[in-house]
Each structure stands twice: as C-alpha cells, then as structure tokens.
C-alpha cells in the first residue's frame, strides 16, 4: 500500500496504513502471501465455469515503492510556497529516476516470475510497473489461485477473474497490486449527477444569475473582469473525458458564439487514450463533456486539450452501484500512464476532471496507487482538479464490507490528498452551499499537514461535539478544498441550450480560474502553480470568499441512483461555517485578490 506520511504542522508524521479499511489481508500460507481477497462474487455476476488453461491474459503488476515518504515530501516541498524548492518541478526523467525501484526489488520479482516460466525478456518494465502475458494455467500457479469465467447477469458478457490471489512469500514485500485479478468491471451509462432542463435563451443578455449561470455571471460574481489566459503551450488546460462522453465541436462553437463572443474561433484538441473515439455525431449523451469544455475553456480561453479515455475502471459494488452493469468507475490508471509518459513540453498545466465515485467502491490498493500517480503529476507541475461529488454526506450511507455499517460516504478521487477538490454553491448575494455538494473525511487517506489546522479547528469549534460520531473518520483527509457555483449552468449539447447542475460544473469553472492565474505567473517569469493545496491553505486562503450559509444533505433512506432502501440518518448534513468546512472548503474564488496573491 502507498503510505501517505504527510507532515502535520507542529506534530509528528501521520501514516496511512492505520486509516485504511478493507485492506488486503497479510495472511501467509504454503509459502504464499495473500494480496487481495473478495468477500464473495460481486453482485451482478455469476460464476459460469473455468477458462481453458491455455487462455492468455495480460497482467499489470505494481511494485512497492521504497521511496514513498521521500517522494511525498518532495511533492510537498515543490508545492509549498514557503519552501526554497517551491515551483522547482521534476522532469519526466528526474521523476522516473527518483522512483526507480532498487535492483533487489526487481530481481526478487523477476526471479519469482522466472520460477514459473515467465522470462525477464517477456516482461515489459516501466519504472515501478511490470507488464506480462501468460496462460491461465501459469497464472494459477503463479498466484496460487483458480481463475473462473464469470457471466454478467444483465448483458451476458463474460470475463475471467478470481476472488483471491497471492504471491510467493519471497516476492510479497515487493508486490503492491496485480490486475486483472479481483477487479470486476463492465460498461454502463455515465453516472455523473447532472440535472438538465431546456433553456430558452440565445445569449447572456438579461440573464438572472440567481436563476441561470452563464460565463458572464461567473466573471461578475468572482470579479474576473475580462481577463483571459494567453494561448501559451506551457499553460495547456487539460479536460478529462470518460465513459464514452464526447465533446462536440459544433456545440462548443455555438456556446462560444452565444456566451463568449470575444473568444470566437477558439477550439480544443482531442487526444485519444487506449483507443478512445472522437464521435462528433454520436446520439449518446455528452452533457458532461459539453459542460466541461464550455466552462473550462469559455472562462479561461486557454490552449486546451480534451483527453478521451476508453474503457471502464474497477468496481466493488455497493448500494449506489449494486449491479456491475451500473459501473461508473473511470479508468484513471490508463489516463495517468498516458499523461506521465508525455514529454514535459506536452503535459497540461491544469487537469480538470468531473467524475468520481464512493471511495469504498474502489479497491483500496487501486485507490492508493491512483492517488500516488496524481501526486506524480503534481511533482511535474500539474494542478489536478476534481469535482467533490453530488451526494452530500452520502447516498448509499452503508459500508460494502459485508457488515452493512451505517456511515457517511466520502468520494474518490476527491478525497485523495494530491488533488484539489471543488464543492458546490448556488445563488448570489449571498452565495450559499448547495445541498448536493459532497464533502467529508476520507476513510483511507490521513489528513495532510497543509489542512491540519483548518480541519482541526472545524472539528473542535464549528462541529457540535459528538455530532455524527461513528459516521465519519475524524482523522481523515477533509474535502472539498474550495467551492464554486454549481447550479443550472447554461450549456449546449446536441444542438440545444440546457441547464446543468452539479459539482461537475464547479471543477471546470475553477480549472479555468487556475489557468488564468498560471498565465499571470508565467507573464512574470514565475513557474506555473502545480499542486495547489499547500498554496491554497497558506497564501491563497485570503483570496477566497468564506461561505457561511447553507449545507449539504444525504442519507435520506433511499439511494439516489439505485433507488434501493438505504440507512436513514435524520438531519444528516455538513453545514457551511466560518473558515474551512466539509461542504464548501475554504470558499469560492475572488479572482481580483487571487491575481495579486499568485505574484507574492
């Protein structure tokens, strides 16, 4: 497991392992170490039989990192405006060299693989990842397990998986994760919480910003004036596309003509990851993609790229996604491998992603690996921004470990310490927290040093003593970090102007703001901002408007996605309060102030 030994202010190091739930077992038997084991066949699948022993499978093996603490400290130093190394980002080559496992680690794993007939020459090595293809018969001996064919009860599709896998005791200290093994996944329509309604409008003229949000509303509310980013390749704005969502150029062009005519002619590049298509005439829903490009680019004007990633990610079913065909988990690793392999000159400076899922629905090893990879982007100077989610304190409100414990549900990757999580607000004069804005405290990641004082103050002074005890982890990473408008954004999709709500709107909005701030820094010969959070919680905090009205809700007794009965928690909520809170974070951006603070 990746260990987030993030330094607490005035305190000792805080380690991750004690805060991880449902971690892989450490049981050792017959010379093998059990890496991961499921409680049973995931909902939505039935075991059909056994694959032919000669069937070939490709496996990815993540090696344990020997420099985890040193790397995390390096990322924090690079990102801390009070440190001498602030802004001294690592190059691709420096990062690879820093994270390269020792010869002992690789040799031990290579020797184990070779003992089962997998030669070193047949294994592709990429820093701390190994990729190899072998037969089912060999894999079963290698991982001391049995692979089976599982059938999806909804669509009849079949996959080969196991419910438990192990590695030889000699290699166990060096192996973090192997996939595909225990991870079940299948396509389903996107799950992002965007609530749509048709709008009759052709421009921003005479818009009531309390009713409908347009780029002009955002610019006025957040004091952005007419400032845009310059089209600088050092400040590329990246937008993540998953789940067969396609950003349509004709809709985007119309949106710009209607709402930001000064950017007429602005467009974006498309990059395909893992064979993702660029369907410009698809009849499938593309609301999420449209919203993201409309506001990230429409507010910033930055040189932009839409990164489309094919496929689906890994899922442990829970009440929000009880059937594997309802899988919304995104293939983050595929995107991260692609980005981290890019030359420094081609990396985006900002990456906006408006997707997420319950933290517990992602296997612990998977979330740990992915979060660490986001940290690697931060080390290379990328600001990674995620929406906080649209389920308030939680929707399923129940653990999926077989115990069915009533609990609030934090969101991943929003609760990863290496991303900037954006919650939601609505209204103007005053701006208030919106009820669906997800927030809370991670069950897996320790509270990082940069927010220690803020979160500790909230828990000790703003939250009623004993309130929600047992429903959340008071030692976990608190999220969101900041907030922005998230209700009824005018956007274009499939030739119509519609209203869209969700923190899916907050993230690209904030990404657009950060892109302009980067442009200001670059114009003054300063490095771009990179991983934002250490700056946000120190110098940047005075550039945000504290939101003290409104709050989130959740745990209503009915799951908002599956509509299954769930635990009911009367009055479940995080309230917006003075200072940081787990619904709006530090508050909403005041660009006028931020544009000065970034030059300090």
Swiss-Prot record:
**Among its keywords, does the record have Hydrolase?**
yes
Q: Which GO terms describe its biological process?
A: proteolysis
> Which residues, if any, are the signal sequence?
1-22
Q: Which UniProt keywords apply?
A: Calcium, Glycoprotein, Hydrolase, Metal-binding, Protease, Secreted, Serine protease, Signal, Virulence, Zymogen
Cofactor binding, per record: Binds 1 Ca(2+) ion per subunit.
| Catalytic reaction list | Release of an N-terminal tripeptide from a polypeptide
Q: Which residues participate directly in catalysis?
A: 288, 292, 504
| Span of domain Peptidase S53 | 212-600
User: Can you list the GO cellular component terms from the UniProt entry?
Assistant: extracellular region
| Protein name, entry field | Probable tripeptidyl-peptidase SED4
- Read off the lineage from the record: Eukaryota, Fungi, Dikarya, Ascomycota, Pezizomycotina
